Amino acid sequence: LQYFEKEVDVFDVSCGLNGSIQYQIDANYLPDGWRSYMAKAVKEKYGKPCMTVGNIRDPKVAEDILARGDADFIGMGRGLIADPEWVNKVEFGNECDIRKCISCNIGCAGHRIGLNQPIRCTVNPAVNTGEDYMKQKVNKPCNVVVIGGGTAGLEAACTAAEVGCTTFLIEKKAELGGLASVISKIPDKKRLADFPNYMIHRASKLHNLFIFKNTSATAELVKSLNPDIIVNATGSVPTLPPITGLHDLVDKDGTNVATVLKMIERINEYPEDMTGKKVSIIGGGAVGLDVMEF
């Protein structure tokens, strides 16, 4: 950097190359604002204003970095894809309305960079169009019944309510959030909880969205709500391989054969030190690799 010192007004301090892409496009296990120490070092060395970037999703984290003097500017990329109104929400005291990036890197890095396709976002389905859809309301009464209170069901229910539909969401469990909330119990996946938490907060502000928890979506109940539209958002279940006897053992009490969902449910029962223990993982996809890493 010393060769450019006299020509530079501001340093944008980042890191990572293709060989260390988990640092170039921050993996979700890296803490918020983790790169700020780099900006601080460059600032102290060259005495020039510095910008820091990297998983800065929380306004408090950004404020602390600036207050400590680690950096003079905060740079955000994925956070503004997830919520283009991030800065405005902070300025006007609406931090609780921020739709935080969960650092999944699927729609932005995977889809846009990896596949050279239009950008997408797991938590912001309107990333390419904005939220103009809210301006066009339904022109006649419309009842919408959404079955399932995971993130897909919450998104469908909120969207329907925001355009003026009377909306009913039915969830058989005591809590909303679905698989995203469950998976966030894995330590390196805890950031996923931000999305269902945001959706639950968004739903709570809609007076025409009625939520039934601990409720089964029976035909009688659905019919009684007089639906014009029914949305099936009941989620997915793990696919089991064709192994003889597997269905008799998997997820049963007293056995050590579990789907990933049951493994997460039992997460506090496993010893912290697994040295000497043998674990067989059937399936080498993303879920299998996550289990192996855990």
Feature map (PLM): residue ranges:
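Flavin-dependent oxidoreductase catalytic cores
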Residues: 1-147, 151, 155-167, 175, ...
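Redox-cofactor binding/interface segments in oxidoreductases and associated redox assembly factors
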Residues: 13, 76, 230-233, 281-282
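Short, contiguous acidic/charged loop-to-helix segments that flank catalytic cores in large enzymes
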Residues: 25-31, 134-142, 182-194, 266-271
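Hydrophobic alpha-helical scaffolding
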Residues: 28-32, 55, 147, 185-193, ...
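Rossmann-like dinucleotide/flavin-binding elements
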Residues: 138-169, 212-226, 237-242, 261-294
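N-terminal Rossmann-like dinucleotide/flavin-binding domain of flavoprotein oxidoreductases
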Residues: 179-227
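Short, conserved catalytic or adaptor-binding loops enriched in Gly and charged residues
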Residues: 200-205, 244-252
